[in-house]
């Protein structure tokens, strides 16, 4: 019995070492100059510009205001993906600062950072617009009666919204409450 336990332990330990060795080999084989992920994103979304993304938003807003819910949902989905990609590209312009060590960041002067601040600000604005788009997609699906997609997008929208986006937070919360048939007054 002791031999079986001992052999089992040896086999288990050997298996764990093999898995560890495989993980180490994978991390060592990552090419820091590999741009395949970036090319994949560009292939998927193209290279968005401020103007093209603004046009997408305007189109989605017009469809939303005209209560063309299905078309608006699809337009906001395209817009949300593209404005998110634009936010990522703008944020990348500030990446050397964020990738720097704590000491290097601490020693970087404001005058050095000042030209990069608008990129970070615009990226944050794009993310905020993406968050709002997710709420609007959820509302569109709610209005079409597609509660599965409504819940999914409202859930993600609420996950992404910041606390200062109170109007959309409230709208999303109210839509979720209606779908879930949750009456705040009755729950008191």
Annotate the PLM regions.
Residues 87-125:
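Acidic, Ser/Thr- and Gly/Pro-rich intrinsically disordered linkers and low-complexity segments
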Residues 83-90, 160-164:
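Alpha-helical junction/boundary sensor with strong preference for TPR arrays
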Residues 51-52, 122-129, 168-171:
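Structural signature of alpha-solenoid helical repeat junctions
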